[in-house]
Amino acid sequence: MKPPSTQSSPAAVAAAAPAMDSAAAADLTDVLCEFDAVLADFASPFHERHFHYEEHLERMKRRSSASVSDSSGFSDSESADSLYRDSFTFSDEKLNSPTDSTPALLSSAVTPRKAKLGDTKELEDFIADLDRTLASM
């Protein structure tokens, strides 16, 4: 990635985002200037770099690995991963299962698909079992 050829100026930021107030524009300018400095630093040879990114990265890794865990023994990142994984499962279950508010007529009106040519016996058995399960609900 090449660093941008033009530096961000407060006037350019203000022109690009006229709806921003002056404090937000100043903050954005500071962030863009810092970003430009980092890009320029990465473009320089390793021994001439001004910032110590490896040290900062290791410090952040240590800080995140020493995050506070709850009483369950799972760290924040493990809990977040689990929640993220389970949210898909939960949404699939919620979408594909009838609820108390679903009228009985709607759930019985859905007809199961017929097995297509080339399907295996195992798949047909699974569908038949699924039909029986849905019929008993």
Swiss-Prot record:
The modification Phosphothreonine is found at residue 111. Residues 57-111 are annotated as: Disordered. It is found in: Cytoplasm; Nucleus; Cytoplasm, Cytoskeleton, Microtubule organizing center, Centrosome. InterPro entries: RGCC (IPR029252). This is Regulator of cell cycle RGCC. Interacts with PLK1. Interacts with CDK1. Interacts with SMAD3. The keyword Endoplasmic reticulum does not apply. Residues 65-82 have a biased composition (Low complexity). It comes from Rattus norvegicus. Induction: Up-regulated in oligodendrocytes in response to complement activation.
